Amino acid sequence: MAHKKAGGSSRNGRDSESKRLGVKRFGGQVVRAGNIIVRQRGTHFHPGDNVGCGRDYTLFALTEGRVEFKVKGPAGRKYVSVIPA
């Protein structure tokens, strides 16, 4: 029989869409209230002064000011604060 049968389908070809996580405003940058500072899964960065934390752990500015990153405590937790201008 000179017929070519259908080839098997590949098991590859799937990948999830990137989630665009990470730091959006870096230390020293000026932010306005509501600006997103960090998008993250879990609290890699913790909210400090004038920073709010959303349902999905997104950190955002509560006031206008300058972004500041700090490491505090014996656990070495990273905190993000907004220093009012």
Swiss-Prot record:
Q: Which GO terms describe its cellular component?
A: cytosolic large ribosomal subunit
GO molecular function: any one?
A: structural constituent of ribosome
Question: Pfam families annotated for this entry?
Answer: Ribosomal_L27
What top-level branch of life does the organism fall under? Answer: Bacteria
Q: Gene3D superfamilies this protein is in?
A: 2.40.50.100
Q: Which terms does the UniProt entry file under GO BP? A: translation
Q: Which UniProt keywords apply?
A: Ribonucleoprotein, Ribosomal protein
Annotated region (Disordered), positions in chain: 1-23
> Which InterPro entries does the protein's record reference?
Ribosomal_bL27, Ribosomal_bL27_CS
Instruction: Spell out the family assignment given in the record's similarity comment.
Output: Belongs to the bacterial ribosomal protein bL27 family.
What name does the UniProt record give this protein?
Large ribosomal subunit protein bL27
UniProt gene name:
rpmA
